[in-house]
A protein has these predicted regions:
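Ser/Thr-glycine-rich phosphate-binding loops at phosphate-binding pockets of nucleotides
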Residues: 1-2, 73
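Signature of the cytosolic headpiece of P-type E1-E2 ATPases
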Residues: 2, 6, 33-36
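Acidic, divalent-metal-coordinating active-site segment for phosphoryl/phosphodiester hydrolysis
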Residues: 4-14, 54-59, 76-85
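Membrane-embedded transport module
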Residues: 15, 19-71, 86, 91-212
């Protein structure tokens, strides 16, 4: 924020951003830190006061250097560089300038922060559903493939092409569609964010496929 340190700290405490053990820092103090120092200390701070556009860019870069997924919200022209640099740039639909909205990945039509929370929940649900759908499809098709290969090796025609087509239509299509529209799991928003470098096929998923 461009507000003073005292104002920013008071607001942050009131809305739960500045928790015990976390600190606030001003733009002039950021100027005194090298990029390496800022990266090292960035996780100490939850509030950045009296910051200029160049400070916001350095803050975003520092968090990204920590392998964090960074979302940046803003409505003014001075927010545009950091919004463009972040993983997810979020512009304000009502109060935002055209420049900000043009560089943003997402525009909040209602300017409500709670909409971002809803979007994160929806994104986590979609990720879970895609993962479950892929696990189901791979396990089903892998078993099918083993049977077909076994038949070829034994020179026995176990399935005709029409049989394989029927199995795929009957056992894959409907369950896959149902999995795609599953509701959010309980406690989905209490999960910690996944590491940026975490592979999609984790040991758990590979083990699940093998057992299936």
């Amino acid at each position: 924020t461009g507000d003073s340190l005292s104002t920013a700290t008071a607001i942050a405490k009131e809305i739960g951003i500045l928790e015990e053990g976390h600190m606030a820092i001003e733009g002039k103090s950021i100027d005194e830190l090298s990029d390496e120092q800022l990266i090292k200390e960035i996780e100490k701070y939850s509030v950045y006061a009296r910051v200029q556009p160049e400070h916001k860019v350095r803050i975003v870069k520092a968090w990204q250097a920590k392998q964090k997924v960074v979302a940046m919200t803003g409505d003014g022209v001075n927010d545009a560089p950091a919004i463009k640099l972040s993983h997810v740039g979020i512009g304000m639909g009502k109060t935002g300038t055209e420049v900000t909205k043009s560089v943003a990945d997402v525009v909040l039509v209602d300017d409500s922060f709670s909409t971002i929370v809803d979007a994160v929940e929806e994104g986590r649900k979609i990720y879970d559903n895609i993962r479950n759908d892929i696990i189901y499809s791979l396990s089903s098709n892998f078993a099918e493939m083993i049977i077909v290969i076994a038949g070829l090796l034994m020179k026995v025609e176990i399935f005709l092409p029409i049989h394989i087509l029927y199995i795929d239509l009957a056992t894959d299509s409907i369950p896959s569609i149902c999995l795609a529209f599953e509701k959010s799991a309980k406690g989905i928003m209490k999960r910690k964010p996944k590491p940026v470098n975490r592979p999609f096929f984790t040991p758990f998923i590979i083990a699940t496929l093998a057992i299936s």
